[in-house]
Every structure is written in C-alpha cells, then in structure tokens.
C-alpha cells in the first residue's frame, strides 16, 4: 500500500497520515527526516546531501529520489509507505515515475483557502507547554490566556495570516498541478485517485479513508 497525500497546508494531511500509519502499520516518509537521518548516518547519499546543504543550496530531485528509493527497501516498508510533502512539483513526480517508484493511492484533501486561513490563523499557543487552542474551535476559558497557568497565549509566526496566504499561493503554483497529473495517471490505470472533503470532522474523513483503503 503505497500512498501519496496531497492538499494545501492546514488541509488535515498530518492528522490523517497519523491515522493511516496507526491503522495500517505503514511508515510515513518525510523527506526532511530522511535527509537528516542520511546525514547523521554518514552514508554516501548523506555526505552528498550535507555538502549541498552546507553550501546553502537546495537538495536536487535526483538526490531526494535516491533517498526515497533507499528508504523503501528497508524492512518497515515491506507493506507499503506514506509520502506526505513529496512530491511537491511535477518534475519531482516525473522523477519518481522514472525511478520506478509505484504509487497505489493518491489521496487529495480538499479544503477551501478561506477555511484553511480560518483554521490556522485562529490558533493560539502556550509556548512553555505546547498547548494549542483555537479562538473558534477550541477557545481557552479566558480569552488569550492559558487554561492551566493563566499565562498569555501567543501566535506562532507560521500561523500569521500573511505567512499562511503566502504558503497557499506557493501551494497553488507548485503543488496543485499534481492534482491533474495524478488524475491522468489514474485514468491511465497507473494509480487510484480519490478526492476527500477535508471540511468534515476528522473522524468522518478517517472513516472514508478506511473504506477506500480497506
């Protein structure tokens, strides 16, 4: 069961990735984690990655694909894997295909931009404990105060509206074209493509995933 999750930041991919990992016992492959692990292990690919990153450059598609290929040969990937946050662009998807990395399911989480902005911008955090609130969906008992300590809540830089809107623009420019790319792949019989309504409750989305994945 080889799965790719698509969707804008804040669409709920991370939450559902956790559900899939726990239910089906397959690992999530995050390219950032793979890069760090390879650098730490001092493997040939890791040394190459370190050299590029130390120079302040972006790691090439080829190197990331090589890391993915190496990672999927490991024991915990026997029953499949979950890719979340990769591929991000059509050249990366093409490179995966050329490398012979097959994908069984592509799952798109569809949430309108304004709802994503609402979800993320409303977050408030108690920095010391990591407790997260939401002004609309999970408000603190006292406005802008932590329930336990009474200390001030803050807004993370990543949760500020300008940052969220910038990330959404990047998503629509770079990653959204993958939707039509993988739909064509599904039409050609190379994968199965499902679009899920990410505006629903977490449990409802998880239930639909369980039906799709069996």
Curated annotation (Swiss-Prot):
Q: Where is the signal peptide?
A: none
Q: What Gene3D superfamilies does the database record attribute to this sequence?
A: P-loop containing nucleotide triphosphate hydrolases
- Cite the binding residues for ATP: 10-15, 123, 132-133, 200
Could you name the domain of life of the organism this protein comes from?
Bacteria
Which pathway, metabolic or otherwise, does it act in? Answer: Purine metabolism; AMP biosynthesis via salvage pathway; AMP from ADP: step 1/1
Q: Which reaction does it catalyse?
A: AMP + ATP = 2 ADP
**Compartment(s) of residence:** Cytoplasm
> Region (NMP): which ranges?
30-59
Q: Per its record, how is this protein called by name? A: Adenylate kinase
The UniProt subunit note reads as follows: Monomer.
UniProt KW keywords: ATP-binding, Cytoplasm, Kinase, Nucleotide biosynthesis, Nucleotide-binding, Transferase
Residues recorded as binding AMP, renumbered to this chain, are: 31, 36, 57-59, 85-88, 92, 156, 167
Instruction: Provide the top EC class.
Output: transferase
For the region LID, give the residue spans.
122-159
């Amino acid at each position: 069961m080889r799965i790719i999750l698509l969707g804008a930041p804040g669409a709920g991919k991370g939450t559902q990735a956790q559900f899939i990992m726990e239910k089906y016992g397959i690992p999530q492959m995050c390219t950032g984690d793979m890069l760090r692990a390879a650098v730490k292990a001092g493997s040939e690919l890791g040394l190459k990655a370190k050299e590029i990153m130390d120079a302040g450059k972006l790691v090439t598609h080829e190197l990331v694909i090589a890391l993915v290929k190496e990672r999927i040969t490991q024991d915990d990937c026997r029953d499949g894997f979950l890719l979340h946050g990769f591929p991000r662009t059509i050249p990366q998807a093409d490179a995966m295909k050329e490398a012979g990395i097959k994908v069984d399911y592509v799952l798109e989480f569809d949430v309108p931009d304004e709802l994503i902005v609402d979800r993320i911008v409303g977050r408030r955090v108690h920095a010391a404990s990591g407790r997260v609130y939401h002004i609309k969906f999970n408000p603190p008992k006292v406005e802008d105060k932590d329930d336990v300590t009474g200390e001030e809540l803050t807004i993370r830089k990543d949760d500020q509206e300008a940052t969220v809107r910038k990330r959404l623009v990047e998503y629509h420019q770079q990653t959204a074209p993958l939707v039509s790319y993988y739909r064509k792949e599904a039409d050609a019989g190379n994968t199965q493509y499902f679009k899920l309504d990410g505006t629903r409750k977490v449990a409802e989305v998880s239930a639909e995933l369980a039906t799709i994945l069996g």
